């Protein structure tokens, strides 16, 4: 789960991590009032959306007086920002962060992520702050430094100091930088983050180390023990289809293609998308109905797939292990009748009760194309979609 920058900074502040003072605003008047309350010579007006690249898209402006705050707030609120992370449709700005300006001396990058290859949290840092870390990794990977953290003992002071020296934090500010990184690590672990990224971390003219931006993502599987984090969820920033899917424990991710996929199991779902691409088709989604799907869940899955107007055909690919093929077949038949499906539908069933499942499909009287294998199904749906 993602949250906004201002929410992430509030969490960091509660852990003693240094961030600039700021206030959230939902209207132009609130933005002006927030700037008055901050009482600083310079304010930064920042669009709050769940995407990076806001500055390049015109979503971050420096205001030197209240009139500029008003002008920028009027221009940004309600506008649609298009960045490399939003897709071509962009995201509408519905809230702003009004923040005190900083006398920036130098920008750095600091982030914590889980390295699945080593099963350890890794602290990454670079003195190339303010730019996309992926770009740094591609062009100058030698400028990224890493410390792998033993989960039994956590981040150690010497590791944080080593990182601070590697990225050339001024010696007199190393102590602050170490405290900053230790606090960030506590947030990452105690709040079950999947990413804790500060880009940029800055040193200021008055000798401070602070987070100028903050990106915190959380492991959705751990949200049951973080009710406070769950309350920060902004449904306006999420795809309505994903929200609807989550109500039925369906894992749905929209893509840009025109072939809807309904599969059980994440691995099979990825393999299904791969084989559709192999036969020159384009999947419209990743949709995993899970191991315990019912006819109701299958029906809802169909409705979610069909809510995407780009979908021109559907490929159902089920391997019945825990899941029984007859249950899926009943769900497919019921869903097809309920939604009045007119698009091409290819179904491949294999596993538990497969013959019974095929019988249900064959006797349904519906225009369902049967596939004998995953490759056969992919070829058929690609051909039908054209």
UniProtKB/Swiss-Prot annotation:
The UniProt function text for this chain reads: Succinyl-CoA synthetase functions in the citric acid cycle (TCA), coupling the hydrolysis of succinyl-CoA to the synthesis of either ATP or GTP and thus represents the only step of substrate-level phosphorylation in the TCA. The beta subunit provides nucleotide specificity of the enzyme and binds the substrate succinate, while the binding sites for coenzyme A and phosphate are found in the alpha subunit.
Q: How is the cofactor bound?
A: Binds 1 Mg(2+) ion per subunit.
Return the PROSITE patterns for the record: ATP_GRASP
* Source organism, top-level taxon: Bacteria
- Which residues does the record give as Mg(2+) binding sites? 199, 213
Give the quaternary structure.
Heterotetramer of two alpha and two beta subunits.
- Which pathway, per its entry? Carbohydrate metabolism; tricarboxylic acid cycle; succinate from succinyl-CoA (ligase route): step 1/1
**Source species:** Bacillus cytotoxicus (strain DSM 22905 / CIP 110041 / 391-98 / NVH 391-98)
According to the entry, every stretch annotated as the ATP-grasp domain falls at 9-244
Q: What is the protein's name according to its record?
A: Succinate--CoA ligase [ADP-forming] subunit beta
Q: Which residues hold ATP?
A: 46, 53-55, 99, 102, 107
Q: Provide this UniProt record's keywords sorted from A to Z.
A: ATP-binding, Ligase, Magnesium, Metal-binding, Nucleotide-binding, Tricarboxylic acid cycle
> What does the entry give for GO biological process?
succinyl-CoA metabolic process; tricarboxylic acid cycle
Supply the Pfam families for this chain: ATP-grasp_2, Ligase_CoA
Quick one: a GO cellular component term? succinate-CoA ligase complex
Which cofactors are reported in the record for this sequence? Mg(2+)
- Protein family (similarity comment): Belongs to the succinate/malate CoA ligase beta subunit family.
InterPro entries found in the cross-reference section: ATP-grasp (IPR011761), ATP-grasp_succ-CoA_synth-type (IPR013650), ATP_grasp_subdomain_1 (IPR013815), SUCC_ACL_C (IPR005811), Succ_CoA_ligase-like_bsu (IPR005809), Succinyl-CoA_synth-like (IPR016102)
Q: Which reaction does it catalyse?
A: succinate + ATP + CoA = succinyl-CoA + ADP + phosphate; GTP + succinate + CoA = succinyl-CoA + GDP + phosphate
């Amino acid at each position: 789960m993602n949250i906004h920058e201002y929410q992430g900074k509030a969490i960091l502040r509660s852990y003693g991590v240094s961030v600039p003072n700021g206030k959230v605003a939902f209207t132009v008047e609130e933005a002006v009032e927030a700037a008055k309350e901050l009482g600083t010579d310079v304010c930064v007006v920042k669009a709050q959306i769940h995407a990076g690249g806001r500055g390049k898209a015109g979503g971050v402006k420096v205001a030197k007086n209240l009139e500029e705050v008003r002008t920028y707030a009027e221009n940004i609120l309600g506008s649609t920002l298009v960045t490399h992370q939003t897709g071509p449709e962009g995201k509408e700005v519905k809230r702003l962060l009004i923040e005190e300006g900083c006398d920036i001396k130098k920008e750095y990058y600091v982030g914590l992520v889980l390295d699945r290859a080593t099963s350890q949290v890794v602290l990454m840092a670079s003195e190339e702050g303010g730019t996309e870390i992926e770009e740094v990794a591609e062009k100058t990977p030698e400028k990224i430094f890493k410390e792998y953290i033993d989960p039994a003992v956590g981040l150690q002071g010497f590791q944080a100091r080593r990182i601070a020296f590697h990225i050339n934090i001024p010696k007199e500010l190393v102590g602050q930088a170490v405290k900053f990184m230790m606090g960030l690590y506590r947030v990452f672990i105690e709040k079950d983050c999947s990413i804790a990224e500060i880009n940029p971390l800055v040193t200021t003219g008055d000798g401070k180390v602070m987070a100028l931006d903050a990106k915190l993502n959380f492991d959705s599987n751990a949200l049951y023990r973080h009710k406070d984090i769950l309350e920060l969820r902004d449904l306006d920033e999420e795809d309505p289809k994903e929200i609807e899917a989550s109500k039925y424990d369906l894992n749905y991710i929209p893509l840009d293609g025109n072939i809807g996929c309904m599969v059980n199991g994440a691995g099979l779902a990825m393999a299904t998308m791969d084989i559709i691409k192999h036969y020159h088709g384009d999947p419209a989604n990743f949709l995993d109905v899970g191991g315990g799907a019912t006819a109701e869940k299958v029906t809802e899955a169909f409705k979610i797939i069909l809510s995407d107007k780009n979908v021109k055909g559907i490929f159902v690919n089920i391997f019945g292990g825990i899941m029984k093929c007859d249950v899926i077949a009943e769900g497919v038949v019921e869903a097809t009748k309920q939604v009045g499906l007119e698009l091409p539908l290819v179904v491949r069933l294999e596993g538990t009760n497969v013959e019974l499942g095929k019988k249900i499909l064959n006797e349904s009287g519906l225009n369902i194309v049967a596939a004998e294998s995953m490759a056969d199904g992919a070829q058929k749906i690609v051909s039908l979609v054209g």
